[in-house]
């Protein structure tokens, strides 16, 4: 689970030049603790704290709750904690991880977002979250959605035995076709 607006809320409060904002956002995307050091100014400790609050849900949420976040970021963190709590309550054996700085592919999202993985399967099964609806260039209400990646899903389900088939070109004699089918 992630909250793409969390870091954005912190960075927007820093009044950084565009190139510094981009460099800092890149350092966060790479989880580059050292790269954050020279760019974050007064938000360095909070941003490093967010990096430390990445991982298995319960310890990550505990670390996240200890951070002194700006108001907008607190709202995003609160939503993340609420959704994670609901997921963990509904499926206590589910492996849930938290990444409060993740936003790659979620830049347009407005709330808690998620990526689905399954152990032993290469790639994401899907991802989704909340995003603004836009009609004819005007923004409207939020929507929620999920994209499932069929290639990954097919790798995740057990394969059945392939059905035996034969190719019978037009004009194949019925006796030959019957013999092939008998094999």
Label every PLM stretch briefly.
Residues 2-9:
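Short, conserved phosphate-binding/catalytic loop or strand-edge motifs used
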Residues 10, 14-20:
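Long, charge-dense low-complexity segments
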